Amino acid sequence: ALGPVAGMPAARFVASHFRVMTKETAQILVAGPAVVERAFGKKMTKEELGGSEIHKLNGVTDNVADSEEDAFLQIKSFLSYLPQNIYELSEKVDCNDPIDRKEEELLSIIPKDRKRSYEMRDIVKLVFDKDSFFEMTKFFGKGIITGFARINGFPVAIFANDSNFYAGSMSAEGAQKTSRFIRLCDTFRIPIVSLVDEPGFLIGPDAERAGTILHGTEAVLATTESKVPWTTIMIRKSFGVAAAAHYGPDGYVLAWPSAESGPLPLEGGVAVAFKKEIASAKNPEAKRKELEEKMAKNQSPFPRAEAFSVHEIIDPRETRKYIALWAERIQSQLKASLMNR
């Protein structure tokens, strides 16, 4: 959208695969200021009703452009990852970025203090082809990161958690964003790379009012119904029902040594499972810490690998190589999936 859009044109805008509107000049409206004033007796400008600052936060627009030129450049970037139509696959481009490139920074990017946040986008930039990441819907459902990138020239979808917002928990908004993105990838047969640091669904009264369990379950269903190849890299946390949204059918699962998983995060799980034991202890706080340290050993990636629920535990510096080789292997699978159209 480059200017004011209301009614049916606004509906066409939100029905698009990629939605971008220009800052200040574009507004998306169900009805304009005159209709709103007549109905509610309230005077508002088009920008106050449906400007980019409103719609980048509620998910109506995926991206905001600084100018018309920027809008067209974003559209061009988005289309570069897609095939010509749904009966073809996206093209691989020439790549001078070696698949065995190792970034030492990946060894220290995850804080030793598991409660501290870090920049997941930095991991994306270090692992995938240089300058290839195109993010969508950044300001809606901020705990979830979605976008496209390339690995050894192959286009892939990026689905990740941002620990800077709600520790990466999946909110109702994040779940809606997830469902739509996975279905977009299904439509155009773009394989998904999931970088997991998922503590679970967002909890609390606001989360319940937002219908988090409803939208979260729909996100999990979108994953289970997905028809594209998935690879999941367990970066750190992978807990609860929400974690299921990060593991596609027959996916290729890798884990960093920093990965931890289970039905509940350590702190909440210990508090619930050992409530009486902690309360009856002479020093409840010391008992709680003792139990948490004991249970933490069971949440490491090594028991999962021994049970074959993780294909490999990898050196973080080799993440690029593993994903690149996977992207090469799945090309025949993607071609076969077109036969079912």
PLM feature segments, named:
Residues 1-341:
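Ligand-binding clefts of soluble mixed alpha/beta catalytic domains
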